[in-house]
């Protein structure tokens, strides 16, 4: 009996495993049915099914899943599943959104039935996931079903895989799922309800299916079709012809493939060079491209029609898009070749083999879609009531809102809509009236199209079906029930239509009326008369002859801008001159394009009335609300400047920035609405295009622009100061603006007259055809059609805001090709360009049907494109029915199905065959299951990227079909079993943990590592993108180059590194330990261990962009000198987070505290490398336990111990190397890794990073300069502080000189770290370097670490448990390091820290990450800021904190609460209030930390607790490292050990520290796991810690002061509070962010993090876990932070942060915090980081490892699980990890985190570019429609339509209306171009930084004069870019402020007019 019972139980477990591991739809259903049969369960009983299943399946793997589902189901909104118990729901379509909706309805207790037309999931296409979707799916147990789910930095998943996950969850919850059932319609309730009470039913096929008998109260359409459910009207969004191509290639999961960098998205507007190179090399012309590595290699791109025609993909050019893309008109072989060529080029030919995966027809999986038109449903739901039965009908997914695929919004908005629909059903079931239900649903739906990852709520753990938890400012009662009555269908369709018409009219009539009042010619004439009244010789009586003399125009301009025209000097007789003067000034100063020339005006008898109306209307709209100058004669100078600014056009502003723009003032309100992230702004612009029926849409822009402009102008009064400042800056910028743009743009003004050889303004300059007023554009005195305005070289359509004009030949070019003008046209000249699309080709257009009535080609699109026509319903298209029926992909799939069946008679290939062919390697290796298993396993997996490839993998699909029989023969269960066999054990461990959040995060991290291991490829991916992508230049280009150079340098330097032997040992160790041979091999093999890592690091750096570079620089800096230190610290105040850079700091410290911060930045570079590390951090996390991911940012020190797990260490080590090789050189500096572990090595590390750093630095430099960089150089304790303090004030002055000095110093330091003779800029640095480079670093670090220790001793008590151990161990090291340090002196002490920075790096890296991330965020865009609420402040605060530590510390603390610990340290300044503020900040940061890190935070915090204190203290000391020689004793115990370690490592060698480090790591891991065991515990601890920190800060103040007195003399008072604060902070952070504060390394992290930014610190420290998971990006940020330079960069790149604010509203705070924090944060942060990490990298690593283990155990794993893992790890990984290895691990983690952060940043920037691109296309299409209507009206008015000339008032009224709309579109376009310009500058800045980094990697004495001059040139150019961005941001900010007050009224007005939706 017992045996049979056990057998049955085991059988159930096997069946459950088979179900979980099933990889096909049918296999899943079959496995589930078998499980239910075995357990004797019947899914029909939906209410109790799940509970019965749970009770009968007592399996530890299942329990982890039950725990997750129980947690989700226990949410109060579901009311224990009793809300909808009597509600029956039918969901059409088992796609991701349909299944997600079903799950929520099931949790509400409803009876849910899902019907799916097919029985196979065959879509390999990849979906981008927003952070909240990842969190949501994790909560549903996604990782239990798919172990690789979003591991590491992965943020995407294939549709097939996502469907499988959701299908399994749905089945477990008792949802009925029927496949092969097609919905055909609704069956109304019969009229005879007396005999049979039958409700609503579904008509399905097959008709006899049981579902046809079901009755439903709710039906939800989620099948992606547009017409499945009737009654939903659709809004059409039409852009330019958009042809999308998707391609899936087989992914064999080889090492080579793993190394290929993903392309998260590249848009033409974002990276033109890449696409131009692609076109020149292959003839392929794309708008954008995305590459995701998933089950397949997935590519999706938007191709230009002409390119497809040229390449023979499309055979004939048709106007109708359906004909154009029909199978008969497409050459499939050419299409395959086209897709393969594009994929090959975009990945830099690095994918070894591009074999197509097969679709479900056995054909290559390549498809082409028409995305020209996209639709959104006007409503989300409606109610039908027939014969007494009500039916709630709703839409979700693509059926509701079609996404623009490059935006990656589809699945996220689909999930949001699914939750909103569930909430609606809940309200419905609770008895709410139908109209109220609909009103609430529509109120919520209006927000959906505006959602972005930045403007949804950030507290993902609070998400529920309640909209309030997801939308920050939702008003669920926005619409009244009476406003949705038309959605209540009672069967009387007549009434419904009448109601709808009334509603539409009520919405649009007011707007039209207003437009009419504005448009009346009498009103315009009256306004002109008032403006010209009193001017001599001016008498305006009409809109024609009165203006001929030109005086009236000049009078209007003079009235508002008397500074532009000397009216009294004008001669009334000189008509031509007067008019030309007015035209030129209006274009140049006001952005109003001329409609004719002065000569033309003088030559005509009577000016053309239509042209004059068009022209004067622009003046009216610009000045109507402005105050005439005469009335302002009594204004003071400032107010007058404000007035001038108010009439300045953004376009003219842009042109002065080197952008040739000639347009009207920008539609500020739309600009922000569209791009800001803020829903409101978006709404407005959106409303134009989508809210109401197309008929009224035209008027909308007018309303929007009118309202906006008026309010904007009215609000000018007090908000113009910013604009005034921007105007003031213009003069400077005009001098600095890129010569090309300036020259190019203004050249035209010289020659404004209309060319004599042409007819005039009514003749096109290009095609010589008639140009009507409405379609007329002018530039450089030429008039032309919009469609004729193309680049002479490449035929790309130009915009007035971005072109280059060659005066010598009168030709126009796109900016990238302006330099080709002398070399003649390229192979593809304009003729080829015509291909762009029939619509775009000027001359060739005529042949296409696009030519319009006027006989000229249609301006906008080729006939094909136009065919869709403006009609809302698409009636003009033959394919209307199809278009209304399905989405682009569905139409293509259906066409494909029909054509394939007809032509080839192919049948569908079974899902199993398809999966076997496409995913053979994955299936064979059981990767999915294994990955999911456990963190250790994940790590292993991660480290073994190469997976065995299946024999079938490369087999052609036909061959696969042949094997079909065999495949079928093998049951899916067997396949799954074999697949998951490997995953079994480890997976079990993982799942046992159940609460695998941390575990998952670990896995994620590990997998991310894997990913990132591929990211070694990652760097390459970037390279691929970046190199080819100079277009990608924004982020990639520079970085790639840098990476390569760095790698080469590394290869050369590796031997030179101070500890070449050590580095190599570390590499070897890493290899040995690493269970990821692939990664290691790749790294080692490719670059001699260093090379590959270098690539990885580079990648990370690239991703992190600025941060890693800074970190690297910092590393180099230590060797550099005080001078360098000054610069570095200024720029690298943020670097402090780069505690990794401590080694650098050490030397720097010696030179100058400021410097040291920069050095940390150097370490930061590793932190950035953390991009790589971030990939590795997961491994560390696994090793560490849950912590590694989160830890990676702060607990990195622990992480190394955690990393002791075989994989983590290996990862870490490579990562460490990678960090060292942020610049390629780093790789060769395995010693660099050692530096992470040992102090000497940091030098090399620094060296490598330095190159990277310099570019980064250069960018941050300005900010740093602002911060007391100079003081940092003082490097001496007192001086540093004071200097820092003063530095802030001297921000501007310091900027350039500091930058230059910083670069020199960096360069020297880099050389040192590389092992070359560094240029000693300061005795300190020389001293540090005197000892072996490592030793020098240790020496400098040593004193610092001592100081830190002094500070730390108090923290140690707090840490007690861990701290005690940590402290004890550190103590021995401390003694050692103290001696070293003492001899070395404070500087050397710092250096010691530097060398220990390896460890410190770990800790630092985590902390660094925070700053890095912050910095990264800042630099990339505010968008990054959102991920970490603290970041916005941190960016500013980070710098402030660092600088502040010396001088602003106190202040900054208050300003930047998030990084209180850091702040606390910075407050070392004597000011006590600042200290208090710091304390407060700390508390706040602590509180924020838990929030930011969520569970992960808690975990990290616990782990870090001990260390946090220390690290905080250390950090505090760090700022004034020079002052801290004495503190070294206190620090010695905890941090001292780090220093001792560092020194001993340097002196004794890694071995001594190695054992200790291991032990410490193990202890720390355990402690952390324990502390993080439960989220609640963590949160509580975090809160307690924050309180304790405050108290401690107060208490510690006294303690700390004494220790830091010597060095910190200046900052001693703040230091006191700071010290205590750091401890408390450390304590809190330990709980919240153990990595940073808890260990020496952690401490360093904390300090750097703290310094980099409170928010960041918070995130990183408190998000050990979060770092791993949701915060991983933040963690990355930290690694980035580590390159605090990134933070500095933020400060330096204020424009970036400002830009961010433009989008996310962080600008104000950021500015404030930036100003303050930048200065102090870099130096203090850097100093602290350097000292602490250096203190005892190894021991800390060990402690950290222990803590990580304990933390991860607590949070995710059961203690047993953790122990099991630990033992496994022990067996797997030789416990002989040396400090180097541990450091390498940490470094890798840091790199991964940085890489991850950078990737997110790039993705956000990409999305911004794509938003702009898409909106520009919308504007272009709308302008084309307006032009067509305008031409028709103009012809009628002129009598050209064969009707004779008419002066019909109605026609004139229509003309006025069209003119207004066009003006609105012009303004809107100019706004978009400003945003595009900002992106361009951001990109340029990024590239320059990278180039500078690379150059700084070479020692100055090895450079030629030319090279040195080039460095200076690059620096100057970068400063110019920063200034331009500042000015742009100031302009945007001013506009934002002006709109702030109007927003509420404007939003209300717009919404009331129907402008509520803006979808893209």
Curated annotation (Swiss-Prot):
Keywords linked to the UniProt accession: Actin-binding, Cell projection, Coiled coil, Cytoplasm, Cytoskeleton, Exocytosis, FAD, Flavoprotein, LIM domain, Metal-binding, Monooxygenase, NADP, Nucleus, Oxidoreductase, Phosphoprotein, Zinc
Xref: Pfam families: bMERB_dom, CH, FAD_binding_3, LIM, Rossman_Mical
Compartments, record wording: Cytoplasm; Cytoplasm, Cell cortex; Cytoplasm, Cytoskeleton; Nucleus
Polar residues composition bias: residue spans: 1277-1286, 1407-1425, 1718-1727
Acidic residues: bias regions: 984-1014, 1485-1503
Biased composition (Basic residues): 1654-1672
bMERB domain location: 1799-1948
Residue positions binding Zn(2+) 1: 764, 767, 785, 788
Binding-site list for Zn(2+) 2: 791, 794, 814, 817
Keyword Flavoprotein: yes
Domain named LIM zinc-binding: residues: 762-824
Alphabetical GO biological process terms: actin filament depolymerization; cytoskeleton organization; exocytosis
Low complexity bias: start-end ranges: 1394-1406, 1594-1611, 1633-1653
Phosphothreonine, modified sites: 887, 1252, 1317, 1425
GO-annotated molecular function: actin binding; F-actin monooxygenase activity; FAD binding; metal ion binding; oxidoreductase activity, acting on paired donors, with incorporation or reduction of molecular oxygen, NAD(P)H as one donor, and incorporation of one atom of oxygen
Subunit comment: Interacts with RAB1B, RAB8A, RAB10, RAB13 and RAB15 (in their GTP-bound forms); binding to RAB1B is of low affinity compared to other Rab proteins; at least in case of RAB8A can bind 2 molecules of RAB8A simultaneously through a high and a low affinity binding site, respectively. Interacts with ERC1 and RAB8A; may bridge ERC1 with RAB8A. Interacts with KIF23 and ERC1; enhances the interaction between KIF23 and ERC1. Interacts with NINL.
Name of the protein in its database record: [F-actin]-monooxygenase MICAL3
């Amino acid at each position: 009996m017992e045996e049979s019972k056990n057998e049955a139980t085991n059988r159930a477990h096997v069946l459950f495993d088979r179900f979980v591991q099933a990889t096909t739809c049918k296999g899943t259903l079959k496995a589930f049915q078998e499980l239910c049969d075995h357990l004797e369960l019947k899914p029909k009983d939906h209410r109790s099914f799940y509970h019965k299943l749970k009770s009968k399946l007592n399996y530890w793997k299942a329990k982890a899943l039950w725990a997750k589902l129980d947690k989700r189901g226990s949410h109060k909104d579901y009311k224990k599943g009793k809300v909808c118990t009597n509600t029956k729901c039918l969901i059409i379509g088992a796609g991701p959104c349909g299944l997600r909706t079903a799950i929520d309805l099931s949790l509400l207790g409803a009876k849910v039935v899902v019907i799916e037309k097919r029985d196979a999931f065959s879509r390999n296409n990849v979906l981008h996931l927003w952070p909240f979707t990842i969190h949501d799916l994790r909560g549903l147990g996604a990782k239990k079903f798919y172990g690789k789910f979003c591991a590491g930095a992965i943020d995407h998943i294939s549709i097939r895989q996502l469907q499988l996950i959701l299908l399994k969850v749905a089945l477990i919850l008792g949802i009925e799922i029927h496949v092969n059932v097609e919905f055909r319609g609704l069956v109304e309730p019969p009229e005879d309800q007396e005999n049979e009470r039958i409700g609503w039913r579904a008509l399905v096929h097959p008709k006899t299916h049981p579902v046809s008998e079901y009755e439903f109260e709710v039906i939800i359409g989620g099948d992606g079709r547009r017409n499945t459910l009737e009654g939903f009207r659709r809004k059409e969004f039409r852009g330019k012809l958009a042809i999308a191509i998707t391609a899936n290639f087989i992914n064999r999961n080889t090492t080579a493939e793993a190394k290929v960098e993903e392309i998260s998205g590249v848009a033409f507007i974002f990276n033109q060079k890449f696409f131009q190179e692609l076109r020149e090399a292959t003839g392929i012309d794309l708008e954008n491209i995305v590459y995701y590595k998933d089950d397949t290699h997935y590519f999706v791109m938007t191709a230009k029609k002409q390119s497809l025609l040229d390449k023979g993909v499309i055979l004939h050019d048709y106007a109708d898009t359906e004909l154009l893309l029909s199978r008969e008109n497409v050459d499939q072989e050419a299409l395959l070749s086209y897709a393969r060529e594009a994929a090959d080029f975009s990945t830099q030919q690095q994918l070894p083999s591009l074999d197509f995966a097969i679709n479900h027809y056995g054909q290559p999986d390549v498809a082409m879609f028409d995305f020209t038109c996209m639709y959104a449903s006007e409503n989300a739901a409606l109610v039908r009531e027939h014969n007494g039965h009500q039916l709630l009908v709703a839409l979700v997914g693509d059926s509701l809102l079609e996404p623009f695929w490059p935006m990656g919004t589809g699945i996220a908005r689909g999930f949001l809509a699914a939750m909103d629909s569930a909430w609606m059903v809940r309200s419905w079931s609770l008895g709410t009236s139908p109209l109220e239900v609909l009103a609430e649903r529509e109120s919520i739906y209006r927000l959906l199209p505006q959602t972005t990852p930045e403007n949804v709520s950030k507290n993902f753990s609070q998400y529920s079906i309640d909209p309030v938890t997801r939308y920050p400012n939702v008003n669920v009662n926005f619409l009244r029930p009476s406003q949705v009555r038309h959605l209540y269908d009672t069967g009387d369709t007549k009434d419904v239509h009448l109601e709808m018409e009334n509603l539409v009219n009520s919405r649009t009539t007011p707007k039209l009326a207003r437009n009419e009042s504005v448009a009346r010619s009498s009103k315009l004439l009256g306004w002109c008369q008032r403006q010209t009244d009193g001017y001599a010789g001016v008498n305006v009586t009409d809109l024609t002859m009165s203006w001929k003399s030109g005086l009236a125009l000049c009078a209007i301009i003079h009235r508002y801008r008397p500074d532009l025209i000397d009216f009294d000097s004008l001669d009334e007789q000189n008509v031509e001159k007067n008019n030309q003067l007015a035209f030129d000034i209006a274009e140049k100063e006001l952005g109003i394009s001329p409609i004719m020339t002065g000569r033309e005006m003088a030559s005509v008898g009577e000016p053309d009335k239509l042209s004059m109306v068009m022209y004067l209307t622009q003046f009216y709209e610009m000045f109507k609300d402005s105050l005439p100058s005469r009335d302002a004669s009594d204004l003071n100078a400032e107010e007058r400047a404000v007035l001038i600014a108010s009439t300045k056009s953004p376009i003219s502003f842009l042109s002065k920035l080197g952008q040739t723009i000639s347009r009207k003032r920008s539609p500020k309100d739309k600009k922000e609405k569209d791009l800001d992230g803020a829903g409101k702004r978006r709404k407005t612009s959106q409303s134009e295009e989508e809210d109401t029926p197309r008929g009224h849409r035209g008027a909308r822009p007018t309303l929007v622009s009118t309202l906006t402009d008026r309010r904007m102008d009215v609000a000018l009064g007090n908000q113009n100061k910013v604009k005034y400042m921007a105007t003031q800056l213009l003069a400077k910028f005009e001098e600095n603006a890129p010569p090309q743009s300036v020259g190019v743009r203004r050249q035209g003004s010289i020659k404004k007259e209309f060319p004599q050889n042409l007819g005039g303004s009514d003749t096109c300059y290009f095609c010589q055809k008639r140009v009507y007023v409405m379609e007329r554009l002018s530039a450089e005195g030429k008039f032309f059609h919009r469609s004729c305005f193309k680049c002479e070289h490449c035929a790309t359509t130009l915009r007035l805001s971005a072109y280059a004009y060659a005066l010598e030949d009168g030709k126009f070019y796109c900016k990238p090709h302006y330099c080709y003008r002398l070399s003649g046209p390229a192979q593809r000249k304009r003729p080829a360009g015509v291909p762009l699309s029939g619509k775009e080709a000027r001359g060739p257009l005529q042949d296409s049907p696009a030519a319009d009535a006027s006989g000229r080609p249609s301006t906008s699109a080729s006939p094909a494109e136009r065919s869709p026509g403006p009609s809302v319903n698409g009636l003009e298209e033959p394919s209307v029915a199809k278009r209304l029926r399905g989405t682009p992909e569905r139409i293509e799939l259906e066409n494909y199905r029909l054509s394939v069946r007809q032509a080839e008679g192919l049948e569908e290939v079974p899902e199993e065959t398809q999966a076997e062919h496409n995913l053979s390697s994955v299936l064979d290796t059981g990767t999915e299951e294994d990955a999911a298993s456990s963190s250790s396993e994940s790590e292993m997996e991660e480290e073994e990227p190469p997976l065995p490839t299946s024999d079938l993998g490369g087999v052609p699909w036909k061959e696969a079909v042949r094997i079909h029989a065999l495949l079928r023969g093998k049951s899916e269960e067997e396949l799954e079993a074999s697949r998951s066999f490997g995953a079994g054990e480890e997976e079990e461990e993982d799942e046992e943990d159940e609460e695998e959040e941390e575990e998952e995060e670990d896995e994620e991290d590990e997998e991310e590592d894997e990913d990132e291991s591929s990211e070694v490829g990652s760097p390459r991916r970037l390279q691929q993108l970046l190199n080819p992508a100079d277009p990608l230049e924004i982020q990639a280009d520079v970085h790639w180059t840098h990476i390569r150079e760095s790698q080469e340098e590394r290869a050369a330097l590796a031997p030179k590194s101070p500890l070449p032997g050590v580095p190599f040992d570390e590499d070897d160790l890493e290899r040995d330990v690493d269970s990821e041979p692939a990664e290691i091999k790749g790294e080692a093999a490719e670059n001699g261990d260093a090379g590959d890592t270098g690539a990885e690091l580079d990648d990370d750096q690239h991703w992190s962009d600025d941060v890693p570079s800074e970190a690297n620089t910092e590393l180099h800096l230590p060797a550099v000198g005080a001078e360098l230190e000054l610069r570095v610290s200024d720029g690298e105040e943020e670097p402090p987070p780069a505690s990794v850079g401590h080694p650098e700091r050490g030397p720097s410290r010696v030179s100058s505290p400021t410097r040291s911060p920069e050095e940390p930045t150097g370490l930061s570079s590793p932190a950035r490398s953390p991009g790589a590390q971030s990939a590795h951090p997961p491994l560390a996390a696994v090793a560490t336990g849950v912590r590694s991911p989160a830890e990676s940012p702060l607990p990195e020190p622990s992480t190394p111990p955690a990393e002791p797990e075989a994989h983590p260490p290996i990862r870490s080590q490579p990562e460490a190397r990678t960090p060292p090789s942020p610049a390629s050189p780093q790789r060769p500096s395995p010693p660099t890794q050692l530096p992470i572990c040992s102090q000497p090595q940091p030098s090399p590390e620094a060296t490598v990073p330095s190159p990277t750093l310099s570019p980064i630095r250069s960018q941050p430099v300005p900010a740093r300069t602002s911060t007391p960089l100079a003081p940092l150089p003082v490097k001496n304790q007192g001086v540093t502080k004071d200097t820092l303090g003063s530095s802030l004030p001297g921000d501007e002055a310091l900027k350039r000189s500091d930058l230059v000095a910083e670069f020199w110093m960096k360069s020297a330091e880099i050389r040192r770290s590389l092992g070359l003779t560094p240029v000693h800029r300061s005795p300190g640095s020389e001293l540090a370097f005197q000892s072996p480079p490592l030793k020098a670093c240790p020496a400098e670090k040593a004193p610092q670490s001592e100081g830190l220790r002094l500070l730390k001793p108090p923290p140690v008590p707090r840490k007690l448990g861990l701290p005690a151990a940590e402290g004890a161990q550190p103590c021995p090291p401390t003694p050692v390091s103290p001696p070293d340090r003492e001899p070395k002196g404070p500087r050397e002490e710092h250096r010691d820290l530097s060398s220990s920075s390896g460890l410190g790096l770990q800790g630092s890296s985590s902390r660094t990450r925070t700053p890095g991330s912050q910095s990264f965020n800042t630099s990339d865009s505010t968008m990054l800021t959102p991920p970490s609420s603290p970041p916005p402040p941190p960016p500013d605060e980070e710098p402030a904190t660092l600088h502040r530590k010396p001088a602003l510390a106190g202040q900054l603390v208050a300003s930047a609460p998030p990084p209180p610990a850091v702040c606390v340290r910075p407050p070392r300044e004597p000011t006590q209030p600042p200290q208090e503020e710091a304390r407060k900040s700390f508390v706040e940061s602590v509180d924020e930390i838990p929030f930011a890190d969520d569970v992960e935070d808690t975990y990290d915090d616990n782990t870090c607790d001990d260390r946090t204190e220390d690290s905080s203290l250390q950090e505090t000391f760090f700022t004034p490292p020079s002052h801290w020689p004495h503190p070294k004793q206190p620090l010695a115990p905890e941090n001292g050990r780090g220093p001792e370690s560092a020194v001993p490592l340097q002196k004794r060698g890694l071995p001594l520290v190695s054992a200790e480090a291991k032990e410490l790591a193990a202890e720390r891991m355990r402690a952390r796991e324990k502390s993080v065991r439960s989220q609640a515990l963590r949160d509580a601890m975090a809160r307690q810690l924050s309180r304790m920190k405050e108290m401690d800060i107060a208490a510690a103040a006294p303690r700390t002061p004494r220790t830091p007195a010597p060095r910190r003399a200046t900052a001693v008072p703040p230091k006191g509070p700071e010290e205590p604060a750091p401890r408390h902070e450390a304590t809190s952070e330990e709980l919240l962010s153990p990595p940073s504060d808890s260990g020496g390394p952690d401490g360093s992290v904390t300090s750097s993090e703290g310094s980099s930014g409170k928010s960041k610190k918070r995130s990183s420290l408190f998000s050990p876990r979060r770092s791993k998971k949701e915060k991983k990006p933040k963690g990355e940020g930290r690694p980035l932070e580590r390159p605090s330079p990134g933070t500095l960069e933020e400060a330096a790149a204020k424009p970036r942060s400002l830009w961010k604010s433009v989008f996310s509203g962080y600008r104000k705070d950021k500015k404030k915090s930036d100003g303050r924090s930048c200065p102090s944060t870099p130096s203090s942060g850097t100093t602290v980081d350097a000292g602490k990490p250096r203190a005892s990298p190894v021991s800390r690593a060990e402690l950290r490892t222990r803590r990580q283990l304990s933390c991860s155990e607590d949070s995710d794993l059961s203690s047993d699980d953790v122990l099991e893992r630990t033992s496994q790890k022990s067996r797997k990984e030789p416990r002989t990890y040396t400090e180097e290895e541990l450091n390498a691990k940490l470094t890798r983690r840091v790199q991964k985190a940085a890489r991850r952060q950078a990737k997110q940043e790039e993705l956000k920037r990409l999305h911004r570019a794509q938003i702009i691109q898409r909106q520009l296309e919308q504007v272009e299409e709308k302008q084309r429609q307006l032009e067509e209507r305008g031409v028709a009206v103009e012809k009628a008015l002129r009598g050209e339509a064969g009707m004779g000339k008419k002066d019909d008032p109605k026609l004139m009224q229509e003309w006025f209306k069209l003119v207004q709309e066009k003006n609105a579109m012009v303004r809107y376009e100019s706004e978009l171009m400003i945003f595009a310009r900002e992106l361009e500058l951001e990109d340029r800045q990024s590239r320059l930084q990278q180039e500078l980094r690379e150059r700084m990697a070479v020692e100055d004495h090895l450079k030629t004069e030319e090279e040195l001059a080039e460095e200076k040139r690059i620096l100057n150019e970068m400063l110019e870019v920063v200034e331009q961005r500042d000015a742009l941001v100031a302009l945007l900010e001013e506009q934002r402020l002006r709109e702030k007050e109007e927003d509420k009224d404007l939003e209300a007005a717009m919404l009331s007019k129907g402008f509520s939706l803006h979808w893209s």
